[in-house]
From Swiss-Prot:
This protein's record includes keyword Secreted: yes
Organism taxonomic ancestry: Eukaryota, Metazoa, Chordata, Craniata, Vertebrata
Keywords: Antibiotic, Antimicrobial, Cytolysis, Secreted
Main subcellular location: secreted
Protein known as: Grammistin Gs C
Homology family: Belongs to the grammistin family. Group 3 subfamily.
Organism, scientific name: Grammistes sexlineatus (Goldenstriped soapfish)
Reported tissue expression: Expressed by the skin glands.
GO cellular component: extracellular region
Cellular localisation: Secreted
Oligomer and partners: Exists as aggregates of 3-4 molecules.
Function comment: Thanks to its amphiphilic alpha-helice(s), it may integrate into membrane phospholipids, leading to lysis of the membrane. Has no substantial hemolytic activity. Has antibacterial activity with a broad spectrum against various species of bacteria including both Gram-positive and Gram-negative groups.
Amino acid sequence: NWRKILGKIAKVAAGLLGSMLAGYQV
């Protein structure tokens, strides 16, 4: 199911982006 895979990738990418932004703000 490519949709499930894309959702998982999007979730991981969002998590990485969020942690990166949080790191820059500190």
